[in-house]
Every structure is written in C-alpha cells, then in structure tokens.
Amino acid sequence: MERFSPKSYKNLTGIQQIIVLFNNFILPGNPWVKRLQKMNLSEEYLNKCQGIINKIREQQNQIQKAAEWFATSILSGRVVHVFGSGHSRIMVEEMWPRYGSFPGFNPIVELSLTYHNNVAGANGQRQAMYLENVSGLAERILRNFGLDKKDTALIVSSSGCNLVPIEMAELFQEKGIRVVALVTKEHLDKSKSKRTDGKKLTDFADLVLDSGAPAGDSMIKIDNLETPVSPGSTVGGIMIINSIKAELAKRLTDAGQPPKVLTAACVIGAEKAAAIFEAAYDEHAHRMAELYKNAGK
C-alpha cells in the first residue's frame, strides 16, 4: 500500500492522489470496506460454486448426449455401468439408488477402493489409494459381469490419472461399449498419469464431462494457511449426475417406459412409496440377473 507523505503526494497525478487517499484514510476506517475485507468464507465458497454451475451450463450438449446414450441402453433392457473409486463413489450412489433415482444402472462400488472411513489402520486410506493404482484390478472387477455392446459406462475420476478407472474405461471400449468420463479437466490437465504410457481416462472416453472444479479441487485460500480448503468437484459432479438423470427420465417417459422413481412417503404417501421401492428394487435385480447370467461369456 502507498504510504501517505505530504511531500511525495504533491508529485502524484490526480488519479494517484485519489488512490493514496483511499488506501490511507478511507479504506482503514470505513466499516463497509472492513466488512468486505472480512467477507464470509462460506459466501466466497458459494460464489465459487456458482462459477461451477456456469461451467456446467456450457456442457448442455454433452449432458444431452450422455442422457441419450443412457436411455438407449436402458430401453433395450441393458444397463449403464457407473464406477468411481475413492470419493468418486459419491457420484455413483447419487445416480442410483437414492430418492429421485431409478433402476437402469449397475453401481460398481468396490469397497476396497472406497471404504476408507477409518483413515488409518485396517481398511485405511493408504490401502485404498494403493489399490486404485493396481494394474489388473479393473479386469477382475468387470469379470463378474456379462457385458454387452448395448451397455454404456460412466466412469468418474477427478484426476483421471489412476490406473483402475483408466483400465476400466479401456476394457469397456474393447467390448464396444461407449464410455462417458466425468473428470475435473483443470485437475486432469495438470496431473500425471500413473500409466507408463501416460494415457489418462479421457484417452478412453467417447464423451467427456467436466466437474468445473479447479486444479487441486480445493477452492478457498485462507491467510497464513499454505494450502487451500473446500473442494468443488463433488458439487459439480453431483449437478452433472442429476442433470443427466432429469434428461434421462424424460426420455424414458417419452418412450413409454416411465422409470420407477424412488420417492419419499411424504410426497406420495407411505403405501405408494413402498410399492414403488419394491418394484424398483425388483427391476434392478432382474437387470443385474442378466449381467450375472452371461458372466464370462
């Protein structure tokens, strides 16, 4: 900040004088300025999230295409395989099963890659981070299912650089299955792939969606704290998931196969909600039975 000095002040231009006066007299004592200086960090985070929303709005064509591909698979009696390791499992569970969602998905949640709530010790974070970079694990996971070209796949990975999601996308493509990758593009671009050939998840994707978060994911910088906090990829990822879900539900309904949407009893009544839950779970079981029936073929 330019410190006030009567002698030097005379030598400044008009605009420079205004800046010096503002910095030295108006800024320090103005309560409104002080309020801005102490801006609530939660408000700053929400502003960053608004920026993520804007980035997702720019991906309408990709969202529509993903919904169209998913609808084609579900209407043909097949499924959309959804996979994510680490925190990316959140997006898998957001797609199905939860309120506002419906059958047609194969949620692949491998506990060895995602159940690390203990952080340290048995089932800890170290093991999960190690396992998501074990080559060949993706093949072992997919060996459980009978895949079909009519399927589609959604692979979620913020960095797009870990081996298991990359190899899973590669295996799906080898089977002729279209792959949608949900990544954080800025983070992916600045990260190094764990594959020796340097290929990333997006190299095995037919369609790429961007969560809109920054490189490193965290969005808020705090004075005297070296590293930023409060990530944004989950916020963006969930908005993309539910945008696709809405478009997909419309397509299924327009095609004469309205989805069985898990709905709260407070919305449609306990009896009807229970009936829909049972019907939705049965449909899911029948679709999964087809996958298991043809495993290994």
Model-assigned labels for residue ranges:
Residues 2-32:
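Short, low-complexity, charge-dense intrinsically disordered segments
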Residues 1-2, 197:
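Residue-level detector of alpha-helix boundary/anchor positions
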Residues 23-24, 32-297:
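Conserved N-terminal alpha-helical segment that immediately precedes and caps sugar-phosphate-binding
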